[in-house]
């Protein structure tokens, strides 16, 4: 049975932890790709990359070798045939030894969260529960276990070294002659970013210490492969998944996560609002090699049966501890929604569109006081630094239409987020700032400028922004336009939008569409910034295209499967993959074939391409004169 059918059948059955299986479609390597590992200063620092092999270029004096291309790989062990994936056991705890060596954590006897203990002791959940063999960790009394705390203390952690190797993408492997051509790129406009040609572990440490970058790495998520979010690094993308009261199962959400990381999701947010949120999240975290984020207020709201006014600090606090003990790497917390800002949204066309923002606005109005997220922020910081959970300070008042873009409410909240950032940094807690939303192109840069001004260069993390509101069903495109622009201006991570945005819960196919669309936006931003090495893959693919190496064209692309499918729809024969044309122009009108013909002619005459063109024109002119200079010939 193929993977798609197997997955569909499994999703229709009641979920059982005893029979859960990985989606077979996520565990095979991409075409002509293999997992390769680069070693660090210690044996257990093994940094994964995807090596894409290329075929040789035919040449008159023999084949010209084309080097393998190395690309950033978010798929974890799933695409490594040497590793057997069993989602019932979860992934290996990659960072566990590093965490243990630091000696600043303690292993608890069980969950400290009241709700966590209730779920663990409920016999009705036995079939759903992930069978975790270890207890949660927490910082020892008086200790701070954040990567920012280590960085500010001058410590370069194994996580930081891992990231430095990963960000460099092994660009130095090219031979001098290859480097001259493949590594050539246009100078970028970086808008004040600092992009070193080679990233060192010390540079990573310094950026984290300054608050310009974060390493989301909860001590209870040792399965994660270290990554970094900051404007002086590669632009990252996030994929949202999660069930709802109407749709989806634990199996489907785990499959969405593994599908998202296969195609390039750097982080995943579980935004579940349906049944068994706790158990769903546990399965996702235990099987995720990328950081996992959540919006804790969603689950807290479920605990009070959906009544925002019944929320309390005690319920929210326990939810934070519950999720931190599971291993959530970053929390979206809408602490910037203040009572005084709610009336500012009254004149909006679309009001408050953030779920978290609307929940807290309703609570503020019901109690006519500041939210507990704002008043208890210092205590939230104490929880965050005990587990190294990063803040993703939520933009609860983001604009939900271009009509409302860049208004008073949006920027009032942003200013408050900057103030909260300073409080978090006082505790050495890592912070990134969430941004809009719906913003027309000419207003996008102001968002980046204001964020840098108010938030002291803390990483910006934006949803798009969507640049127009006229395309339901295509909002992955309307938002990718804005995402590419704001990524260029300095946004560190882009939250993907799928074609289902505003319309329904995305399935696996929608997740892939959103990921690929946002990989394009992030890469376009890296190119525009002039990120060192960003253009290498473009150059390699362009060379393959010009040389009619069809398989290399497919495999160097973001989605080899779709590229091959589109080519084969019109030219399915295997021989067509050796042809010097495609179905777009046919054999006689292919511009690249014509150019190659000119070069072949030049080589045969021993002249340059320009001389060949001139010589060819002279020959045709002589032929025209010899035939009697008649414009039209009788046939």
Curated annotation (Swiss-Prot):
It catalyses: 5-amino-1-(5-phospho-beta-D-ribosyl)imidazole + S-adenosyl-L-methionine = 4-amino-2-methyl-5-(phosphooxymethyl)pyrimidine + CO + 5'-deoxyadenosine + formate + L-methionine + 3 H(+). Its EC number is 4.1.99.17. Zn(2+) binds at residues 438, 502. Keywords: 4Fe-4S, Iron, Iron-sulfur, Lyase, Metal-binding, S-adenosyl-L-methionine, Thiamine biosynthesis, Zinc. Residues 1-14 have a biased composition (Polar residues). Its cofactor is [4Fe-4S] cluster. GO terms for cellular component: cytosol. Substrate binds at residues 240, 269, 298, 334, 354-356, 395-398, 434, 461. Pathway: Cofactor biosynthesis; thiamine diphosphate biosynthesis. Residues 1-41 are annotated as: Disordered. GO terms for molecular function: 4 iron, 4 sulfur cluster binding; carbon-carbon lyase activity; zinc ion binding. GO terms for biological process: thiamine biosynthetic process; thiamine diphosphate biosynthetic process. InterPro entries: ThiC, ThiC-associated_dom, ThiC/Bza_core_dom, ThiC/BzaA/B. [4Fe-4S] cluster binds at residues 582, 585, 590. Binds 1 [4Fe-4S] cluster per subunit. The cluster is coordinated with 3 cysteines and an exchangeable S-adenosyl-L-methionine. Homodimer. PANTHER family: PHOSPHOMETHYLPYRIMIDINE SYNTHASE, CHLOROPLASTIC, THIAMINE BIOSYNTHESIS PROTEIN THIC. Catalyzes the synthesis of the hydroxymethylpyrimidine phosphate (HMP-P) moiety of thiamine from aminoimidazole ribotide (AIR) in a radical S-adenosyl-L-methionine (SAM)-dependent reaction. HAMAP family: ThiC. Belongs to the ThiC family. This is Phosphomethylpyrimidine synthase. The lineage of its organism: Bacteria, Pseudomonadati, Pseudomonadota, Betaproteobacteria, Nitrosomonadales.
